[in-house]
Amino acid sequence: MTTIRVKDNEPFDVALRRFKRTIEKLGLLTDLRAREFYEKPTAERKRKKAAAVKRNYKRIRAMQLPKKLY
């Protein structure tokens, strides 16, 4: 469980922002959303493969030279 100690004279907004940043770094929200509903193993493999293809395509596009701008 993640805990945040609120410092003396620290506004609530700042403490809440620190808490949100910590949760985001740990990846808890994405993990909870992924586990919210059961996903069949075949659907999980299909989703991961599609993400890998997308990443690969994006990497290849980044390595290509830009088209002439004229």
UniProtKB/Swiss-Prot annotation:
Entry-linked Pfam families: Ribosomal_S21 (PF01165)
The alphabetized UniProt keywords are: Ribonucleoprotein, Ribosomal protein
The UniProt GO MF terms for this protein read: structural constituent of ribosome
Q: InterPro entries of this UniProt entry?
A: Ribosomal_bS21, Ribosomal_bS21_CS, Ribosomal_bS21_sf
The superkingdom listed in its UniProt entry is Bacteria
| An example Gene Ontology biological process | translation
For this UniProt entry, what's an example GO CC term?
ribosome
Instruction: Give the similarity note.
Output: Belongs to the bacterial ribosomal protein bS21 family.
What name appears for this protein in its UniProt entry? Small ribosomal subunit protein bS21
Gene encoding the protein = rpsU
